[in-house]
Each structure stands twice: as structure tokens, then as C-alpha cells.
Amino acid sequence: MGCSGCSGGCGSSCGGCGSSCGGCGSGYGGCGSGCCVPVCCCKPVCCCVPACSCSSCGSCGGSKGVCGSCGGCKGGCGSCGGSKGGCGSSCCVPVCCSSSCGSCGGSKGVCGFRGGSKGGCGSCGCSQCSCYKPCCCSSGCGSSCCQSSCCKPSCSQSSCCKPCCSQSSCCKPCCCSSGCGSSCCQSSCCKPCCSQSSCCKPCCCSSGCGSSCCQSSCCKPCSSQSSCCVPICCQCKI
């Protein structure tokens, strides 16, 4: 069809020219400033998906104003702040973990399958649709927690999203249950030195150890006990 006011002629596959598409409803975009590009006008516009722009045809894996293979073109972002969401029902990517959004705090969108990056859920996948953080411990703190930063102070709830617990049993990979020996998987998983004689650091030494201690970083300020936590750093001389 003809495209008046544009450079060149438009073929039969042209959706329209420039801003003179007409008939575009809410949530639909036009051709922008370009003319005579294939199937350009009156298509759903995807908002606020990263790594896309509509500055030129094909930059989003398709024509301007069309959701391409990269997730779509940036359109009117609305309240999403240039990241995700804000498109309403015409978005090309899921923006919420639940169909009604609600607890996700984002814009309504298509729920799709669980897991993947949807509206802030992260890449490790949610254990339930209402989850907004990367993962949650279902119960307790140990191996059921995907990563150390996904737990609340008290990990009894099914929805937990904060760092290590304040209790002796914390959400990091491991903790010493009692003593310091092999019950502690690694030094990085323990709380700072306990106030008790048995602490969670790799080792502690009693007074008089001095230079005979393997590593100064493994010792507590001198304590009254003669035994120190693993690994044994020194033969204490009293």
C-alpha cells in the first residue's frame, strides 16, 4: 500500500509508515520514526526487558514494535524503572512468580513455569509461586537452603530470605554443633569465636602459646583452657 510522506514505496508486507499506523489499541506500538519496514505497526510492544532497543529494525530479533527472540523491544516502561514489568498483559516475558502478581510486588504478567528469572525470583528457581528471592529453605537451615543468603533469622518459616540466623544453628553451609572438631565442615561456615571454651573458629590457643602457634589467625585471645580448637595449633607451655 502507499505510504505518503515517506521515502520510497511500501510493499504489500508493510504494516504502515511512521506514526500514521492508526487503529492501534492500548498496549500496541507503531513504527516509530522509520517507514516501510516489514510488519511494523500495531503489534504488542514489550516493555522494560533488558538488552533490547528499538533504535533500528532487527535489533530485537524482529521488526520495530514486535517481540523478538531476545524478549522484546523497550517500549513504555511505566513504573518498572527500566528493568522488567510494566507491560500489563502484552508483555513477552513473565514478570511475576504468581499469576496475580500480588506478593511479588511487580506488574501483572504471565506466570509460566516455575524457575528461571521471573520478576526478581532469580535463577535458582522458587520453591513456591509466591517466592520473590532466589530460593528458600523449606524447613531448618542446613542443606535444604540453596544458598547462604536465602534464609530469614528464624528458618522455621517456609518463606525465608535473609542471611545467617542468629541462633547457634545458622543458615550457612555448616556450623559446629558442639566442640570444634570435624563437626565443623569448614572455617568459613562458622560464627565468630564462641564465648564458651569450645568455639567455632578453626582453632584456639591457651595462654603461653606465642610463636609456637601454627597460625596467629587461628587463635582466640588467650583463654584459660589448655586445649585449643582444631586444627591443633600448638603445644601449650604453661
Swiss-Prot record:
One of its GO terms (cellular component) is intermediate filament. The keyword Repeat applies. Interacts with hair keratins. The keyword Repeat applies. Restricted to hair root, not detected in any other tissues. It comes from Homo sapiens. In the hair cortex, hair keratin intermediate filaments are embedded in an interfilamentous matrix, consisting of hair keratin-associated protein (KRTAP), which are essential for the formation of a rigid and resistant hair shaft through their extensive disulfide bond cross-linking with abundant cysteine residues of hair keratins. The matrix proteins include the high-sulfur and high-glycine-tyrosine keratins. Keywords: Keratin, Repeat. Sequence repeats lie at residues 35-38, 41-44, 47-50, 91-94, 150-153, 160-163, 170-173, 189-192, 199-202, 218-221, 228-231. It comes from the Eukaryota. Belongs to the KRTAP type 5 family. Residues 35-231 are annotated as: 11 X 4 AA repeats of C-C-X-P. This is Keratin-associated protein 5-3. Transmembrane segments: none annotated.
